[in-house]
């Protein structure tokens, strides 16, 4: 059977956890392929709400194997705390598999992340301060420490000792911060190693065998397309590649295994942190979207910036990811608005453009060109079929399909597992 990719088509927080959980009932493995604990997703099952940061949403399905792939950077303390929290709520975490090739977030990564962000002042990126960027930086510089190094205390000690010679010089002499103590870190991570060892595996091999045996594998990205380090609004991006092209690499499987790429897209637009946002609403409407949609970060708690749907970035996401389907979320949040504008292009110095500007300078100056659609006032949270939606809501979905360039195959009308309309089967 083929692999499926689930990717955020905006700036993250699109509702990937809900989509993954829904699809989890039809898949055998759910693989997180990039990012770290700088992002979170929420899954609501009945009266229970689960906030996950590192563990794939597939953990909440008893017949699904959750996998943390080699493209992820892992803070073992955070991972174990998340595992313990799920265990306390009756979730069996023994199924979790962790790639031996994934990189570890170390104390010096967190320290450097925080101090560099403070040093940048007004030019700061808006990092979560969890060490994600410095960890990916060391991975590329070939000075990183991997999960497999936890299995060999001698190798772990040698690698860390060598790395800390440089990192402590930077912390102490450049930023006037306390040095990281080698022995303290070695002791801390030795405890992590004991607990994580049963979960460490050659996940690429396991996934390849599963696919050959006819199993269905879902590859789950974190963040979103516009936060991709290559294709996003650089430098206001994450340090990895959430886009679909990295899914195979970050999971350890071949790209020809992938047959479908599903883009998760919110019925309006949100963004956390700094960076350009053409449709942003700095008014009461924006505040209302934030309040009704509960737009506060799962990981940071920060209020998300809100705006109307931007079809230009949606078209861009369809293009760079090769999206075959869209999963539209939070349509219910728009109930009650008299009008629901869609940004269909940008005004750049008096000239209309319909595609993503080539440069970030242009994108910073892009002004949205809207087409207005009538809104609806009905509560749609209990609707379970497309045919039963209000006419204006159906027209809105059709317009999003037309302007985005991909079919909407599922629609979320609330946070619950069952609050979804399936238009086209995704698995």
From Swiss-Prot:
CDD domains for this protein: AdSS
Residues that coordinate or bind GTP: 12-18, 40-42, 304, 330-332, 412-414
Note describing how the cofactor binds: Binds 1 Mg(2+) ion per subunit.
InterPro entries: Adenylosuccin_syn_GTP-bd, Adenylosuccin_syn_Lys_AS, Adenylosuccinate_synth_dom1, Adenylosuccinate_synth_dom2, Adenylosuccinate_synth_dom3, Adenylosuccinate_synthetase, P-loop_NTPase
Localization (cell): Cytoplasm
Residues binding substrate: 298-304
Entry annotation: catalytic residues: 13 (proton acceptor), 41 (proton donor)
EC number(s) per entry: 6.3.4.4
Alphabetically ordered keywords of this record: Cytoplasm, GTP-binding, Ligase, Magnesium, Metal-binding, Nucleotide-binding, Purine biosynthesis
Residues at which IMP binds: 13-16, 38-41, 128, 142, 223, 238, 302
Pfam name, any one: Adenylsucc_synt
Pathway(s) this gene product operates in, as recorded in its UniProt entry: Purine metabolism; AMP biosynthesis via de novo pathway; AMP from IMP: step 1/2
Quaternary structure (record): Homodimer.
Function: Plays an important role in the de novo pathway of purine nucleotide biosynthesis. Catalyzes the first committed step in the biosynthesis of AMP from IMP.
Record's protein name: Adenylosuccinate synthetase
Origin species: Frankia casuarinae (strain DSM 45818 / CECT 9043 / HFP020203 / CcI3)
Gene that encodes the chain: purA
């Amino acid at each position: 059977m083929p692999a499926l990719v689930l990717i955020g088509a905006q700036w993250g927080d699109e509702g990937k956890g809900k989509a993954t959980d829904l699809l989890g009932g039809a898949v055998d493995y759910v693989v997180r392929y990039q990012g770290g604990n700088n992002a979170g997703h929420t899954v609501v099952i009945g009266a229970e709400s689960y906030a996950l940061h590192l563990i794939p949403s597939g953990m909440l399905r008893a017949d699904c194997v959750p996998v943390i792939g080699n493209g992820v950077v892992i803070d073992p303390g955070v991972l174990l705390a998340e595992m313990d929290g799920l265990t306390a709520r009756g979730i069996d975490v023994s199924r979790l598999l962790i790639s031996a090739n994934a990189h570890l977030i170390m104390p010096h990564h967190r320290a450097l992340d925080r101090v560099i962000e403070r040093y940048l002042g007004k030019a700061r990126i808006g990092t979560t301060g969890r060490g994600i960027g410095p960890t990916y930086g060391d991975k590329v510089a070939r000075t990183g420490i991997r999960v497999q190094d936890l299995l060999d205390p001698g190798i772990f000690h040698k690698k860390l000792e060598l790395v800390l010679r440089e990192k402590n010089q930077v912390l102490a002499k450049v930023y006037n911060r306390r040095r990281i103590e080698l022995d303290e870190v070695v002791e801390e991570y030795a405890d992590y190693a004991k607990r994580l060892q049963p979960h460490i595996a050659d996940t690429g091999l396991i996934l390849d065998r599963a696919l050959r045996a006819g199993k269905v594998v879902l590859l789950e990205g974190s963040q979103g397309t516009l936060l991709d380090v290559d294709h996003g609004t650089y430098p206001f991006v994450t340090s990895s590649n959430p886009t679909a092209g990295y899914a195979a690499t970050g999971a350890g499987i071949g790209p020809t295994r992938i047959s479908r790429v599903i883009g998760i897209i919110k019925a309006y637009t949100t963004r956390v942190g700094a960076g350009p946002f053409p449709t942003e609403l700095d008014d009461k409407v924006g505040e209302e979207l934030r309040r009704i949609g509960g737009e506060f970060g799962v990981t940071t708690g920060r209020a998300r910036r809100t705006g109307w749907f931007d079809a230009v970035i949606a078209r861009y996401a369809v293009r760079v990811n090769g999206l075959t389907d869209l999963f539209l979320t939070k349509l219910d949040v728009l109930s009650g608005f008299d009008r629901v504008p869609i940004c269909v292009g940008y005004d750049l110095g008096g000239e209309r453009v319909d595609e993503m500007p080539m440069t970030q300078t242009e994108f910073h100056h892009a002004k949205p060109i809207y087409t207005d659609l009538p809104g609806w006032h009905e509560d749609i949270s209990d609707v379970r079929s497309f045919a039963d939606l209000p006419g204006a809501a159906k027209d809105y979905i059709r317009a999003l399909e037309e302007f985005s360039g991909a079919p909407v195959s599922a629609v979320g009308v609330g946070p619950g597992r069952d609050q979804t309309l399936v238009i086209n089967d995704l698995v």
